Amino acid sequence: VQPQVGHGLRDVLIELLLLFAVGYNILLAFINAQLFPVSPAMTYAAELLIYAGCFGIGIWTLERHKIAALLAGIALIVGVLLFRYLIEWRVDAKFIRDAIIPFAFLVLGSAYGGSLPRLFLRMAIIVSLVAAVELTVPNVYGDVVNPKSYYVNTRGSDEGGFWNEDSNLFVSATRPGERNFLAGSSLPRASSIFVEPVTAGNFIVFFCALLLVFWRSMGPKRLALSVVLLLFLIVATDGRLAAGTSVLLVLGAPFMRKLDQRLSFLIMPLVILGAAMLVWVTGVSEYEDTTLGRVWLTVHALRNMSAEAWLGLDFDVAYTYFDSGIAYFIASQSIMIVGAFLLAFAFGLEMPTEDGQAFKNAFMLAFAAGLLVSNSLFSVKSAALWWFVLGAMWQLPIGTWFSHLPAPENEQKQLADHAPLAGAS
């Protein structure tokens, strides 16, 4: 009984840490709005606390060869970072943060022994409830959380850039023009616990991928509730990209489940090739703040980036092409790290179940598609969710490949502690 109690307490602690990782901004925004101004240093401290917690809790459960693999990856990043520093005499803390997140949440996820579907259904309920309150009384949400003040104080945003002077919501929450969904209404775009709508949209894509992987092992009531929450959040956030990416995941789900996970490194290059063909077919020739305009920016950036930018030696390029996540990825980390990431992800992060393979491939598809138009998937609020689930699925013992089917008797004991991770409800 004692070990089970210990594991249960650890799982609760892990769940709270994950919720804090994706929702800490709303806590700091509340403090900023109601108690005292929050500085950028406080947001950095919160993130450092999160990463320390991830490693502190999770590292003890990893097998030695997996610890060695993670250390090798960290060593490669440190080596490239040192090389870039010796050439440029410059370090960007944000680029380092981007590289730490996958390792931290892989480690945290590997220590989790609870049910992934139940965990994220609870999280989706929380996100939906806060979004519902925000849509019902947007002025109250704006006064209590005040995203405008929070982003001005912690991100250096220009208050003049918030075009709606009558609202304290995030700038894109009350963008000009009609809503895509519920056109004609005066509703804002919901931000929920994420404080800004883009990350709320990223959560929708993640939750959709999770449902596509685990729906077999969810009961009818939980599955129906999950679908209702997903549709509500799409309408609440008014997320075109979230809706489009979710449709892409639904259409690609059968293929993602069957695609050999070792071929996942091909997904990003194929998505980029598809983007180039889309730009050519549509004839887009300049940047606009639209989905297609941002796709054009990605294609344009990859065609025009200098050799220094590809090698990660021109730090400014990452911010020049801020709306192109792929250009940002290459310029901020270097093409060497990007290539190593794709290969390590495909061949090193081996999933022992079909569900794991399906989620792994779905992540790469969503990641590549999202990076065509945004670099928001590098934020801890979005990236933590994906890497946490990948870590949980990675740490499953080798057993039944089809995790929704019962394991043979000789594998039951080995799988017992981790069965919920495979999707059992």
Range-by-range predicted roles:
Residues 10-18, 68-77, 108-160, 359-363:
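Interfacial loop-to-transmembrane-helix boundary motif in multi-pass membrane proteins
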Residues 14-32, 50-95, 104-106, 128-130, ...:
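N-terminal hydrophobic segments of proteins, predominantly signal-anchor/transmembrane helices
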Residues 22-38, 93-94, 236-239, 358-402:
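Membrane helix-loop boundary segments at the extracytoplasmic
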Residues 51-57, 209, 247, 251, ...:
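Transmembrane alpha-helices of multi-pass inner-membrane enzymes
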Residues 53-60, 85-139, 342-351:
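Transmembrane alpha-helical segments and their membrane-water interfaces
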Residues 118-140, 164-236, 245-255:
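Alpha-helical transmembrane segments of multi-pass inner-membrane proteins
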Residues 211, 215-226, 247, 251, ...:
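Hydrophobic transmembrane alpha-helices and their immediate junctions
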Residues 292-329, 333-340:
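TM-adjacent membrane-interface loops and short helices in multi-pass inner/ER membrane proteins
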